[in-house]
């Protein structure tokens, strides 16, 4: 166990690993500790879509950075990442949504993000098995893609190690030691690490850990489900990811079938007071009744789902924030205590850019 490190990152999901990677690339002394194994929280069960288009221009730029990073990471580290730049479709099914897409196109082009406007038929040419009866138009981002969340994280961790970062698994953070308002150490169950700065990337555990030093992180865990189908005729390996915000659903190709999930208007919270310490590589029980509303929306878009075999329905809790934006930066309550959490189920897309931004702040 090391005795000191200028910077300690708590949490070995994709955001923690990305932050370690970027800090190490800046030549800074950094140690990452993870209470279980890397990706054991919510990273391992994420669907893995990597889309760049958001209503916020700054976030869109961070997501664009993630794409650039993931595109080179496998070559840099020698580890497979599952990264596939198959493009992403975003549907608009009414005039209001179409106007939003037009505004986003202008924003995207202003900082060099490639984005094409498509007719319903052109969108269907890229995604042949979807119904377009209610589609007003679509946006296509050819540099969107998908990745294997665990593999991406392991590649980031290797890249960090290659630049001198220390990564220590199965080590639980217990207490931040503060003297006269200054962070001086982090106590763990394996010993104390003298440090100057702490970056809290604990995912769903962030709120409860940050509270121990008086830092408020407004996030809560919600159940988030997606299903994985058997092979479906017409689903090719290069099928773009698909987002349908008016139906609150998304799709990606998964070994010749589809992964499909969505966002219920009445989501179910989980572990509101405290996320269990040992919730590692764990899932919640599938809730087919609650998923029915998402499934009905998806059937309207992809009728072939009605006869598709279902491999599994994955119910993995994710952390969400009140405004739908992630929480990133130095806490106002404690100097040199940084937070990267609350990624609202798009942490894989945000991970590369969020880690870069955190590293530059730290």
What are these model-predicted stretches?
Residues 149, 246, 285-362:
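C-terminal catalytic lobe of FAD-dependent flavoproteins
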Residues 24-44:
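Glycine-rich FAD pyrophosphate-binding loop
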Residues 18, 53, 176-287, 293-305:
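Flavin-dependent oxidoreductases
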Residues 61-64, 91-100, 140-158, 168, ...:
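Short beta-strand to alpha-helix junction loop
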Residues 5-31:
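N-terminal Rossmann-like FAD-binding beta1-loop-alpha1 element of flavoenzymes
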Residues 81-90, 104, 120, 124-163, ...:
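Helix-loop-beta segment of a Rossmann-like dinucleotide-binding subdomain
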Residues 139-197:
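Helical element adjacent to the flavin cofactor pocket in flavoenzyme catalytic cores
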Residues 48-126, 248-251, 255-257, 278, ...:
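Dinucleotide-binding Rossmann-like beta1-alpha1 core, especially the glycine-rich loop
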């Amino acid at each position: 166990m090391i005795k000191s490190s200028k910077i300690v990152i708590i949490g070995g999901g994709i955001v923690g690993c990305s932050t370690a990677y970027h800090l190490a690339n800046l030549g800074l002394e950094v140690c990452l500790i993870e209470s279980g194994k890397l990706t054991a929280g919510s990273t391992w069960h994420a669907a893995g879509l990597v889309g760049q288009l958001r209503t916020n221009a700054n976030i869109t730029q961070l997501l664009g950075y993630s794409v650039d990073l993931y595109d080179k990471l496998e070559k840099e580290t020698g580890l497979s990442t599952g990264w596939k730049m198959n493009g992403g479709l975003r549907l608009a099914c009414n005039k209001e949504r179409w106007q939003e897409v037009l505004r986003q196109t202008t924003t995207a082009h202003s900082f060099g993000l490639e984005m094409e406007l498509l007719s319903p038929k052109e969108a269907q040419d890229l995604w042949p098995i979807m119904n377009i009866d209610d589609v007003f138009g679509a946006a296509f981002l050819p540099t969107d893609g998908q990745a294997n969340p665990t593999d991406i994280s392991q590649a980031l961790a290797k890249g960090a190690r290659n630049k001198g970062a220390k990564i220590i698994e199965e080590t639980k953070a217990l207490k931040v030691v503060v003297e006269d308002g200054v962070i001086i150490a982090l106590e763990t169950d394996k010993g104390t690490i003298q440090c100057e700065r702490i970056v809290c990337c604990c995912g769903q555990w962030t709120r409860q850990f940050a509270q121990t030093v008086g830092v408020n992180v407004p996030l809560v865990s919600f159940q988030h489900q997606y299903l994985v189908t058997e092979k479906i005729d017409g689903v090719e390996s290069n099928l773009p990811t698909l987002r349908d915000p008016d139906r609150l659903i998304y799709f990606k190709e998964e070994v010749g079938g589809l992964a499909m999930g969505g966002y219920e208007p009445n989501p179910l919270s989980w572990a509101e007071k405290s996320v269990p310490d040992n919730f590692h590589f764990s899932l919640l029980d599938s809730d087919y009744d609650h998923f029915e509303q998402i499934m009905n929306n998806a059937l309207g878009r992809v009728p072939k789902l009605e006869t598709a075999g279902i491999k599994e329905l994955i119910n993995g809790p994710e952390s969400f924030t009140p405004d739908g934006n992630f929480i990133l930066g130095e806490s106002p309550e404690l100097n040199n205590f940084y937070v990267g959490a609350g990624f609202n189920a798009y942490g894989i897309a945000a991970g590369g850019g969020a880690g870069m931004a955190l590293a530059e702040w730290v």
